[in-house]
Amino acid sequence: SLDRGTTESIDNSIPFFAELGKMNIETTLQGFYTNAKISGSENQKVYEKYLKIKSNLNDENLDLLEKEIKNNVTKNAEITEEINNKRDKLTIRKYLYTANFALVNPKYEVSPYIALTEIPDANLKLLDTISKTLDPKVAKSKYGKRLKEWIKERRTNEEN
């Protein structure tokens, strides 16, 4: 991430997916995070596609949270159960979307990164499938290796 220095603002850094070659980050001091435009990284483009859908899923979760807070006043058991069911389905959608995204983008280093950061506790078969479908170059990358190590560590811990 790119850090603008010491400030009281919550948008002190710009997260981006770096790769070899020339990259360009343009922004303003007033909107350091929100106005950032990043170019020169194919992985960043792919990551931004993922983040758009993740943002939509987060919005759905916030809507459920709002309903839950409102329901805390009336304490309607049916509404509570409905909210919990919707949240469970949303969690499943998030996991499936994330896994599918990683599986259909095996040529990008961002795929194992997303698997590691978004669904590290997913079913081992799913993580293993993601790892095995990675392009050989990606499998040898930092996050490809970390994903493989994470799967091995989880297998060891689950066997004990």
Residue ranges and their predicted role:
Residues 96-160:
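Charged, long alpha-helical assembly modules
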Residues 22-24, 31, 89, 125, ...:
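A generic structural micro-environment signature
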Residues 1-82:
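A non-transmembrane, solvent-exposed segment enriched in polar/low-complexity residues
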Residues 65-101, 112, 118:
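An accessory alpha-helical subdomain
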